[in-house]
């Protein structure tokens, strides 16, 4: 049998030799953007990687015949991001990818994320990342408020630090934080990101927070505070916010004519989540938030959990966590060491009201300046408990020689609110209109004697030296019951002319009232005079229609939570609480006793 090779034509020989060569023809057409790239490969392939640049996907540049990692540099003007796209186009997954990419390339000291998840709950899977300070959902309205308040507090604190240390730019501040010998190194916050997934729902459910987000978006970049927002329609994102979001990413829109980038977005294929267009007007395939090298969104929840664990294992530090208002704050927790009767008048009449939502510090009523307090709320909202706590705080600060109380307590809700020693000697407790009317007349006669004569000096007015005796607190629980039981003339009428001089004559008025009667109460000559004078007012839980106002937020709230309106502004607080007598809980005896 012959072993000679069969003869081949020249063409076959040439093709065989060319096929084995190392050099290949230039590929003009690259594969289509179909499969997403995992974050670990985005990080490895990102040749532009630098601090505060996050690799987020693959960008197709057909004119240059290139497909390279596309990312966002948040250190400059593009540090605020708007993401538009119809439902199920990949917006929430993009946010997950952004956070995981940032966490994979930065420490929890460098970047922190505070998230409001009003979408499909995808951001909840990132909660255990050390870079994430908190995630709030629509089922946690108080936590949503706190997330925004926390980020705004960072912005305000940065403004003060920049002013104090004459910092010229956020770039300089980042360098200062990296220097352990610089006071700025004590700042636990780096670049802070407020992430809101679902802007239309946010505006609809939290309209009072929109101005705060606008402030953060408009002012934050200069101080290293960023905003990232997703929306299904660009028209939902009003220009007052949209114009501050320098980076825009567009997934497939429900109406392609709404594009904010270019008509090229019409070419984004349907039913292809993750496909988008950037401001460079190139097509993108966004990555997926996984570190296992898998080019797929399958089993993404397990992949995210694994990625979160991998990143958490690398770090020992943690982003500052979102603090929330307590459901109940007791007076003794709020005011553990009250100043005593030996303190000066101003200190004794600085009375704690509750904890501020904005920064969780104590909110005070400066009763030496604004001597009254009004409390409006629906039944079971905590009106009487707050009045009880305020009365108790006043009594702890003042001796019986310094303050005395008169009560209008038709429901006996103020039992034990004021010690016997701090009650007026006569007419102190009034449970019906007959006794109250007589007591108020007598009180008015005595207080008129304290009106300042016309020839007093400023120093004498400040010292209140023309009269002596205790301040008087008129505590009225359930104002609506008092007015309903009265005739044509209010029992408080004799005190009405004295209210403008209340601070001079030592008169303080504390009133609780049903929220449904609040608007009518503020029209009353007595309560209305106190309200019109700018007295601190607590609006507890209620219906919006109970007190129609553009400036005052009345809505359903947990017991004790109130919208405080006062001379220093408006804010949400959790008011101080004391147990009523029937709820007092005694500690069990210790073992062996």
From Swiss-Prot:
UniProt key word Transport: yes
KO phenotype (gene knockout): Increases efficiency of DNA conjugation when disrupted in donor strain. Loss of secretion of EsxA and EsxB, but not their expression.
Subcellular location as annotated: Cytoplasm
Pfam families: FtsK_SpoIIIE
PANTHER family in UniProt: SPORULATION PROTEIN RELATED (PTHR22683), TYPE VII SECRETION SYSTEM PROTEIN ESSC (PTHR22683:SF1)
Further details from the record: DNA conjugation in M.smegmatis is unidirectional with distinct donor and recipient strains; mc(2)155 is a donor strain while MKD8 is a recipient strain. Mutations in a donor strain that alter DNA transfer do not always alter DNA transfer in a recipient strain.
Official protein name in the record: ESX-1 secretion system protein EccCb1
Gene designation: eccCb1
């Amino acid at each position: 049998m012959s072993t000679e090779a069969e003869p081949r034509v020249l063409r076959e020989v040439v093709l065989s030799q060319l096929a084995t060569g190392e050099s290949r023809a230039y590929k003009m057409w690259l594969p289509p953007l179909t499969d997403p790239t995992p974050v670990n490969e985005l990080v490895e392939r990102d040749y532009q990687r630098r601090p505060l640049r996050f690799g987020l996907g693959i960008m197709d540049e057909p004119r240059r015949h290139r497909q390279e990692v596309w990312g966002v540099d948040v250190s400059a003007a593009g540090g605020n991001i708007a993401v538009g796209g119809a439902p199920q186009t990949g917006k929430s997954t993009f946010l997950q990818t952004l956070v995981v990419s940032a966490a994979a390339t930065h420490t929890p000291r460098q970047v922190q994320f505070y998230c409001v998840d009003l979408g499909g709950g995808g951001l909840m899977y990132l909660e255990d990342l050390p870079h994430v300070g908190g995630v709030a959902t629509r089922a946690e309205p108080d936590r949503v408020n706190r997330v925004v308040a926390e980020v705004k507090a960072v912005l305000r604190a940065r403004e003060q630090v920049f002013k104090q240390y004459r910092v010229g730019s956020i770039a300089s501040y980042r360098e200062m934080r990296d220097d352990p010998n610089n006071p700025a190194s004590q700042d636990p916050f780096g670049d802070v990101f407020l992430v809101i997934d679902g802007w239309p729902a946010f505006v609809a459910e939290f309209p009072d927070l929109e101005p705060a987000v606008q402030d953060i978006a408009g002012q934050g970049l200069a101080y290293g505070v960023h905003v990232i927002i997703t929306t299904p329609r660009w028209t939902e994102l009003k220009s007052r916010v949209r114009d501050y979001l320098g980076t825009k990413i567009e997934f497939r829109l429900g109406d392609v004519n709404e594009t904010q980038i270019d008509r090229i977005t019409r070419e984004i294929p349907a039913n292809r989540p993750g496909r988008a267009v950037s401001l460079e007007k190139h097509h993108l395939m966004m990555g997926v938030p996984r570190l296992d090298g898998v080019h797929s969104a399958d089993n993404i929840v397990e992949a995210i959990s694994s990625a979160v664990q991998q990143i958490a294992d690398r770090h020992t530090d943690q982003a500052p966590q979102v603090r929330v208002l307590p459901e109940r704050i007791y007076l003794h927790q709020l005011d553990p060491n009250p100043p005593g009767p030996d303190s000066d008048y101003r200190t004794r009449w600085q009375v704690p009201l509750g904890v501020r939502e904005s920064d969780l510090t104590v909110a005070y009523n400066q009763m030496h300046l604004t001597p009254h307090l009004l409390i409006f709320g629906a039944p079971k909202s905590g009106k009487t408990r707050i009045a009880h706590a305020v009365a108790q705080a006043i009594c702890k600060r003042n001796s019986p020689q310094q303050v005395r109380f008169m009560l209008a307590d038709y429901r006996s809700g103020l039992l034990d609110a004021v010690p016997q020693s701090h009650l007026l000697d006569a007419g102190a407790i009034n449970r019906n209109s007959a006794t109250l009317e007589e007591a108020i007349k007598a009180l008015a006669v005595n207080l008129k004697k304290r009106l300042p004569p016309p020839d007093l000096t400023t120093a004498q007015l400040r010292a209140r030296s023309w009269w002596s005796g205790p301040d008087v607190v008129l505590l009225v629980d359930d104002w609506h019951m008092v007015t309903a039981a009265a005739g044509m003339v209010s029992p408080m009428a004799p005190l009405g002319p004295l209210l403008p001089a209340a601070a001079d004559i030592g008169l303080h008025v504390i009133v609780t009232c049903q929220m449904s009667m609040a608007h009518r109460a503020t029209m009353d000559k007595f309560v209305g005079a106190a309200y019109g004078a700018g007295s601190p007012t607590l609006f507890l839980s209620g219906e919006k229609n109970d007190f129609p106002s553009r400036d005052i937020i009345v809505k359903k709230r947990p017991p004790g939570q109130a919208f405080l309106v006062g001379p220093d502004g408006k804010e949400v607080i959790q008011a101080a609480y004391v147990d009523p007598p029937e709820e007092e809980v005694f500690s069990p005896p210790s073992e062996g006793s």
